[in-house]
Amino acid sequence: MALMVLPFIGPLSVLEGLIALTTVCVVYLLLKHFNKEIPGGLRQLPGPTPLPIIGNLLKLGSKPYLSLTEMSKRFGDVFQIQIGMRPVVVLSGNETVRQALIKQGDDFSGRPDLYSFQFINDGKSLAFSTDQAGVWRARRKLAYSALRSFSSLEGSNAEYSCMLEEHICKETEHLVKEIEKVMKTEGKFDPYRYIVVSVANVICGMCFGRRYDHHDQELVGLVNLSEDFVQVTGSGNPADFIPALRYLPSKAMKKFVEINNRFQSFVQKIVNEHSATYDKDNIRDITDSLIDHCEDRKLDENSNIQMSDEKVVGIVNDLFGAGFDTISTALSWAVGYLVAYPDIEKGLFEEIKENIGLNRNPTISDRSNLPLTDAFILEIFRHSSFLPFTIPHCTTRDTSLNGYYIPKDTCVFINQWQINHDPKLWQDPSSFNPDRFLSEDGSEVNRLDGEKVMVFGLGKRRCIGEVIARNEVFLFLAIMIQKLCFEEMPGEPLDMTPEYGLTMKHKRCNVRASLRLKDGC
């Protein structure tokens, strides 16, 4: 799950009693940092002057991705800020980020030892763990293998090319029926409310081998738990950047730990059930696949690393979280853009009608024949930039970038929003225009431009579920456009302003949807 532990602290009155206690420590750490000897030929990182205790916190505001983008115009693609007592290097610019995460990938592949990370999956999270490189690589390899092997399994019949396609197609059909029902009774619906349940059902089917009714209390509870997680993490954890605060009572931190424990217990229960009923000759889902990979074997012949049940729980937890919030947020934005740009929606439907028809569902293999749909998705990722930052990185050794010295164990933020809105890369970046990704005749997507869009990270920490996520967004969206026509609700104007948080969502809204006729809406 793409967590952003940036921003940030709310009212600062809680710090008043700590000033005397922490001043000496702050001064010592600042002096130690700024006086560190810079190797010959390298420069000290530029950046704004920090205040005592809080650093540059006040400069970040409620939309740090915008604040840091403005700072990059002044200080360049590599600069340093101070959040509380922790120095943070901020990377912007397509070439700079690719240099760091790909060409110097080993140097920037770490995760910072933030206080809150130890409570995510009980410290065993694949995405957030600060495990040593050998352990992390082995677990990542296992998770990727299980994810890929199960998602590519044959479907239950020839209609589906793989298990993933079957789960998505069936769930989208349920989604269309649910929307049809609510439109008959209410005349409007909240897209996110229905999409998030459908996406959760797909990942439940993949990970746990079960599907829930849309109104099932266990599923609704999971969705609510995820939304609580997004809300509490979106406000940030001050103790990550001001260590003394971890000794003070915090309602937000208490809720954060509580949410993680509840979800951990849910996944642990399912893993226990799978372990008890595991049959090597009948792999039912990703959880079974993980157990199968780990059963009495080592992950890496050279590393002597074995996988415990606890690590399996952590991986399943990560896969569920990552496949849940990111995809549902992307699809919610997609519906918003369809409503906001009816001419584009009409063009997308015509493309699907012409290339696939209306008598069968789109499939993953149809993606190459629907360039406008593919370009539309890329522009959603770019324009919304609903994942404005990657999970924070950390340097694993003393290194340099663009001539600047960066010490080992430095926290690093990757500003994906800046890259996706950089006028050096994109003409008129503030406008929504899927055509920017199409060839002159509109027959294909320019893959080089598509690869510039930052959403799933890069390099050694790139999201392992990226291919599955892209296919899932495509298939959900293509089927919805084929079956439904979305319109703005009279008297309820659509507000596409992003709300900063774990993932950036637009404001919740109601829209109308109707089953399509052969000629369109």
Swiss-Prot record:
Keyword field: Endoplasmic reticulum, Heme, Iron, Membrane, Metal-binding, Microsome, Monooxygenase, Oxidoreductase
Chemical reaction(s) catalysed: an organic molecule + reduced [NADPH--hemoprotein reductase] + O2 = an alcohol + oxidized [NADPH--hemoprotein reductase] + H2O + H(+)
GO annotations of cellular component type: endoplasmic reticulum membrane; intracellular membrane-bounded organelle
Bilayer topology term: Peripheral membrane protein
Residues the entry annotates as binding substrate: F229
EC number: 1.14.14.1
SUPFAM superfamilies referenced in this protein's UniProt entry, alphabetically: Cytochrome P450
Cofactor(s) recorded in Swiss-Prot or TrEMBL: heme
Predominant cellular place of this UniProt entry's protein: endoplasmic reticulum
Compartment annotation: Endoplasmic reticulum membrane; Microsome membrane
PROSITE patterns per UniProt: CYTOCHROME_P450 (PS00086)
Gene3D superfamilies per record: Cytochrome P450
Taxonomy, superkingdom: Eukaryota
Assigned protein family: Belongs to the cytochrome P450 family.
Function field: Cytochromes P450 are a group of heme-thiolate monooxygenases. They oxidize a variety of structurally unrelated compounds, including steroids, fatty acids, and xenobiotics.
Protein name listed in UniProt: Cytochrome P450 1A1
